Amino acid sequence: MGALRWLSIAATASTALALNPEGLISAPRRSEAIPNPSGDVAVFSQSQYSFKTHKTTSQWNVLDLKSGDIKLLTNDSDVSEIVWLGSDDSTVLYVNGTNADIPGGVELWVSDISDFANGYKAASLPASFSGFKVVTTDSGDVRYVAYAESWANGTAYNEELVAKPLSSARIYDSIYVRHWDYYLTTRFNAVFSGTLKKSEGKGKATYKADGDLKNLVSPVKNAESPYPPFGGASDYDLSPDGKWVAFKSKAHDIPRANYTTAYIFLVPHDGSKTAVPINGPDSPGTPEGVKGDAGSPVFSPDSKKIAYWQMADESYEADHRTLYVYTVGSEETIPSLAADWDRSLDSVKWADDDNLIIGVEDAGRSRLFSIPADAGDDYKPKNFTDGGVVSAYYQLPDSTYLVTSTAIWTSWNVYIASPEKGVIKTLATANKIDPELKGLGPEIVDEFYYEGNWTKIQAFVIYPENFDKSKSYPLLYYIHGGPQSSWLDSWSTRWNPKVFADQGYVVVAPNPTGSSGFGDALQDAIQNQWGGYPYEDLVKGWEYVNENFDFIDTDNGVAAGASYGGFMINWIQGSDLGRKFKALVSHDGTFVADAKVSTEELWFMQHEFNGTFWDNRENYRRWDPSAPERILKFSTPMLIIHSDLDYRLPVSEGLSLFNILQERGVPSRFLNFPDENHWVQNKENSLVWHQQVLGWLNKYSGVEESNEDAVSLDNTVIPVVDYNP
């Protein structure tokens, strides 16, 4: 067992309370902590769902950055966003999600945090805008950007003011037809700019809307920003001097369903000129051969430079993300930074005009690194955070950083760190605040490395409540999606390993071939190897666990996975490894090889299987879970979950698998949500999902009998449709 890196679990048993599905789903969910200009306090939002009232309540709080104390700012559920206004330590601009004058619109209000309820309305906006970024100019005026849906003519889309069409028909002459969970229309996301004029009056200055909003995206045909379904405020930035806006858009001049290519556009804040790409095919500074996705544009403090990341490959969504720094107005080739570093960045911010901070996935964590703005390609950035996954970071006046993160053991962790000293002080953490998470701590998690098919593979181990290594617990083998993704030391409300562990399992979550954060070689090796290298890594991982962990019962083990993990569960069902498990759970996995062409992002399958469906069909069929010889091996009880709004992997994939399992006489159940996509996010649906998944696993692993508090399939009140005689 020398490869296992024990934390404190070897010496002491955990005293954590069991985390159950209701507690997970109803525990408070908090946003990033956003500091004021002086770094004295920070604001953050909090929402909480109640299974008693079946409603969500929300509030905004103030965190004292010296004491860590938290106090309520407002529990007005209409307050959707708050940003600090200028250099004033107590004045904020907030978004009121309702509009007294325009149904479906929002309002901008200005208030002092010491007297929040007595603010005033500064602007009335004609649609549902969000993602506000603001700067105060030398004149004292406030310039801002935000986004909303847009009509082709550039006006903001307001759903409440649109007449319902007489026909529901949709007509398409190009792809996409649909994406993620929606059908494309002639509408698109767009970044708008606006100004609040400062007026000096009695007491404090006041602000009022000045002029109309400007659509900065619509003048570029086929451009869209933020880019759905996951784009947001990180897709654009406003220069500190208020003069420029940079935004990301997928390439507007090539088919978007076939390529990942994206450009960073630059446009005056007032929209006086049409946006132009700084890294497009005709841009003078575009690096040679760099044609892939791009994102996270951010201006330097002096507004003279833009940092962003970009991939080289135009068909590989998980290609290496390299950092670039563009000088505004320059026609020189845009230089890359630390391009030889075997890590791919997720986010970037400026520390000052000469240095940057980047967020990077690294060995199952997401850490912060510092890097000079003129670093060469051979530079190795320096890490200054440790475990967990960083979700946000803001520079404080003393050049330290206010960091918001999560971990497997906490949903919210706020601390101060610096490039020179590392983590300095923890201010607040959810497992000390929330009764639902009471007692959770880093001791519930370990990791180990083992020899995989061709290299060492990392795996997390998550222990159950009151773990005792002298006892034996069934294995729950956790397989992640992506496939170019990974299990991270992060909190999840959908696939939380601690919830599974506390039923009475030891969860083992490997990061096999294809996993991100362990170098490009491991990640890229999955291409055309979906059922090859990763499966072999998982087999070797199971063997390692079986041989080395006396407290893990592999005879009664179970396995579960989603998306690519769902594919792998389907593949395992027809493989020898499938006979090692008492039950399987497949969530939104591909099943029929020839159905892969029904997805929306065609570049994905074309990259993964080295070509198009018609030129390389054998590559698609090479790893086909529905191959006849594999179906004949199906025998392990299996729960299949697939929802109607999943357009990435259509619901027919799950139905096909369920049909075959039923006809083969394999114990099986199909769980469907007509209103969910690739994920299950509705709180009540999430509870049913957990009850069914955990109940299925508990039934066949024996946990249902050994743990009187374990979730049972009978916990679900939804009736089961069963027409068997």
Swiss-Prot record:
Keywords annotated in UniProt: Glycoprotein, Hydrolase, Protease, Secreted, Serine protease, Signal
E.C. code: 3.4.14.-
Alphabetized Gene3D superfamilies for the sequence: alpha/beta hydrolase, TolB, C-terminal domain
Xref: InterPro entries: 6-blade_b-propeller_TolB-like, AB_hydrolase_fold, PD40, Peptidase_S9_cat
Subcellular location(s) of the protein: Secreted
Family classification: Belongs to the peptidase S9C family.
UniProt name for this protein: Dipeptidyl-peptidase 5
Species: Aspergillus oryzae (strain ATCC 42149 / RIB 40) (Yellow koji mold)
